[in-house]
Amino acid sequence: MKKTPLLNVALSRVIAGMGHGDILVIGDAGLPVPPGVELIDLAITPGLPDFASVLRVVLSELQVERHVLAEEMQKVVPPALVEIERLKGKLGKREWLTHEDFKVLSRSARAVVRTGECQPYSNIALISGVTF
């Protein structure tokens, strides 16, 4: 059995296969998943799992060079943004896009991880870095 916090097989596989510059999106329950992009659906009920818990576990395994957020998140300030601020040392450089442009970016993702989060704009695109 794995010794690290991430136990989900599909998510472990995607992270293990990511290279420098690859994108992994963690999204709320309402974020659309573009056709052709793998969906890793963790949502079981509204609020479970929450965005922050999934982000913390993903960051235990993924080296992140930069991250992208929707500009609209700044106006709503969901709990997700509070957690992102807390973890900013593990997230690299920050970029902002409109929510519509964020959805366009998600077309390039290796996968979209759907959480049970129901706070608006609780989405992040993680761009993989290198450990050397």
From Swiss-Prot:
Catalytic activities: beta-D-ribopyranose = beta-D-ribofuranose
Pathway membership: Carbohydrate metabolism; D-ribose degradation; D-ribose 5-phosphate from beta-D-ribopyranose: step 1/2
Sorted UniProt keywords: Carbohydrate metabolism, Cytoplasm, Isomerase
Disulfide bonds: none
The keyword Cytoplasm is assigned to this record: yes
Biological processes annotated in GO: D-ribose catabolic process
Cellular localisation: Cytoplasm
Annotated residues for binding of substrate: 28, 99, 121-123
InterPro entries in the cross-refs: D-ribose_pyranase (IPR023064), RbsD-like_sf (IPR023750), RbsD_FucU (IPR007721)
Record EC number: 5.4.99.62
Annotated Gene Ontology cellular component terms: cytosol
GO molecular function, one term: intramolecular lyase activity
Residues the record marks as active site: 20 (proton donor)
Signal peptide: none
Top-level division of the source organism's lineage: Bacteria
Pfam family, one: RbsD_FucU
Role description: Catalyzes the interconversion of beta-pyran and beta-furan forms of D-ribose.
Complex formation: Homodecamer.
NCBIfam families cross-referenced by the UniProt entry: PRK11797.1
Record-linked PANTHER family: D-RIBOSE PYRANASE
Family: Belongs to the RbsD / FucU family. RbsD subfamily.
Protein name: D-ribose pyranase
Lineage start: Bacteria, Pseudomonadati, Pseudomonadota, Gammaproteobacteria, Pseudomonadales
